């Protein structure tokens, strides 16, 4: 499994619009084949907000199917990337593999 973490830093006055765009995108992401988990989280630090999107993918083919050929580029709705001060995407190999459910 692959864990993908998108971290975006926003000015506080842009955070509401960015969060709205991300919440609009989540249903699209949740229905993509191979996605096992997704969580959108934030923390407020002074005049900025940091947003993290945690994704867990069953395999690299599923991740590429969602993200496209350049995994370092985020897949965001139009207008979202222009709202950020800093944007990072990182990928990790999951080490704590969940057992498959019985009968499936």
Regions found by a protein language model. Name each.
Residues 2-8:
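Active-site-flanking beta-strand signature of metal-NTP-handling nucleotidyl enzymes
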Residues 9, 41, 54-56:
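Short hydrophobic/aromatic beta-strand micro-patches
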Residues 9-21:
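Short, surface-exposed ligand-recognition loops at beta-strand->loop->(often short) alpha-helix junctions
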Residues 28-36, 56-91:
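An amphipathic, aromatic/His-enriched active-site/gating alpha helix that lines ligand/cofactor pockets
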């Amino acid at each position: 499994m692959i864990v993908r973490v998108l971290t975006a830093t926003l000015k506080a006055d842009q955070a509401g619009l960015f969060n709205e765009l991300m919440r609009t995108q989540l249903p699209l992401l949740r229905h993509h084949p191979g996605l096992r988990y997704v969580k959108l989280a934030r923390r407020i630090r002074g005049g900025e907000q940091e947003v993290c999107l945690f994704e867990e993918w069953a395999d690299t083919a599923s991740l590429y199917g969602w993200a496209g050929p350049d995994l370092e580029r985020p897949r965001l709705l139009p207008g979202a990337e222009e709202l950020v001060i800093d944007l990072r995407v990182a990928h990790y190999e999951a080490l704590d593999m969940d057992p498959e459910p019985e009968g499936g």
